[in-house]
């Protein structure tokens, strides 16, 4: 004969429920500072390591619900109505890098946005939501909502190289009420690259910058030939011409048939040493001989 499973029936007490609700209300009275909407709660590098995982819960919230009794934690919920994932790369837009992302509730195994792929060579913000509440006790036991993914890069990117920064931003609310919303499609907003401003706005600034390191002590303003002379110069061509005052010459008169000459001084050049012309084949620089 098969044995029927034994189960202990739940029994309720109105007084116990009233007392528990009062305890929950008192516990949540200090959550005003926590429920302040969106906050940038984290920042961590995107690395070429294959996978990453981050828990979407702040230390402040964990510390807050850690003070609750087990009964109170079982009646308190944590909501993440809005989740943003911002990314800014340090790699160039010509470097191949892709990430595949998803959200997962570890307590229930539910997943959202699985298969979402983004290029990690561009800056963007992803907008998501988790349309249901999380039990505070599950969050306290590290079984809350997690954002994770895998990263794959080009073979030229070294392993464990930091290729950018992740900035997860989410809303976090501790409440006695439960969130019940429809699931929205993931939305991506891509940033447009900015432009480099003008660094030098005039020739004067550029000239001053260049002159701070470039020498102009020996320089011509326009293009000049560095040497203007013959291709070959004799070292013995220069000499001083003398005058021989002992020689006279008679210049003939116009009507004199005999051709009488008047003697006068005559310029006589000094004997020159005949120069030897070198052939082009045998020529060499005398200054370096």
Swiss-Prot record:
Pfam families linked to this entry: Bromo_MP
Coiled-coil portions: none
GO CC terms of this entry: host cell plasmodesma
Biological process terms in GO annotation: transport of virus in host, cell to cell
InterPro entries, per the entry: Bromo_MP
Keywords: Host cell junction, Transport, Viral movement protein
Principal location listed in the UniProt entry: host cell
Subcellular localization, as worded in the UniProt entry: Host cell junction, Host plasmodesma
Known role: Transports viral genome to neighboring plant cells directly through plasmosdesmata, without any budding. The movement protein allows efficient cell to cell propagation, by bypassing the host cell wall barrier. Acts by forming a tubular structure at the host plasmodesmata, enlarging it enough to allow free passage of virion capsids.
Family, as annotated: Belongs to the ilarvirus movement protein family.
Name the UniProt record assigns to this protein: Movement protein
């Amino acid at each position: 004969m098969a044995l029927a499973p034994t189960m202990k029936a739940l029994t309720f007490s109105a007084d116990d429920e009233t007392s528990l609700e009062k305890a929950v209300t008192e516990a949540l009275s200090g959550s005003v500072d926590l429920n302040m909407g969106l906050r940038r709660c984290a920042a961590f590098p995107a690395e070429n390591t294959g996978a990453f995982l981050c828990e979407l819960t702040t230390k402040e919230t964990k510390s807050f619900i850690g003070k609750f009794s087990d009964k109170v934690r079982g009646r308190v919920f944590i909501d993440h109505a809005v989740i943003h994932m911002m990314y800014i790369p340090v790699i160039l837009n010509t470097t191949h890098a892709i990430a595949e992302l998803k959200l997962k509730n570890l307590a229930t195994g539910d997943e959202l946005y699985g298969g979402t792929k983004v290029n990690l060579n561009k800056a963007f913000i992803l907008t998501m939501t988790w349309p249901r509440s999380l039990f505070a006790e599950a969050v306290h036991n590290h079984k809350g909502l997690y954002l994770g993914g895998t990263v794959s890069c080009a073979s030229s990117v070294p392993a464990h190289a930091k290729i950018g920064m992740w900035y997860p931003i989410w809303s976090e609310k501790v409440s006695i009420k439960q969130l019940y919303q429809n699931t929205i499609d993931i939305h991506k907003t891509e940033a447009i690259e900015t432009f480099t401003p003008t660094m030098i706005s005039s020739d004067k600034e550029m000239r001053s910058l260049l002159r701070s390191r470039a020498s102009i002590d020996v320089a011509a303003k326009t293009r000049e030939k560095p040497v203007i002379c013959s291709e070959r110069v004799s070292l013995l061509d220069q000499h001083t011409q003398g005058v021989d005052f002992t020689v006279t010459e008679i210049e003939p008169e116009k009507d004199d048939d005999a051709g009488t000459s008047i003697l006068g001084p005559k310029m006589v050049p000094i004997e020159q040493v005949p120069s030897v012309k070198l052939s082009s084949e045998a020529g060499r620089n005398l200054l370096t001989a």
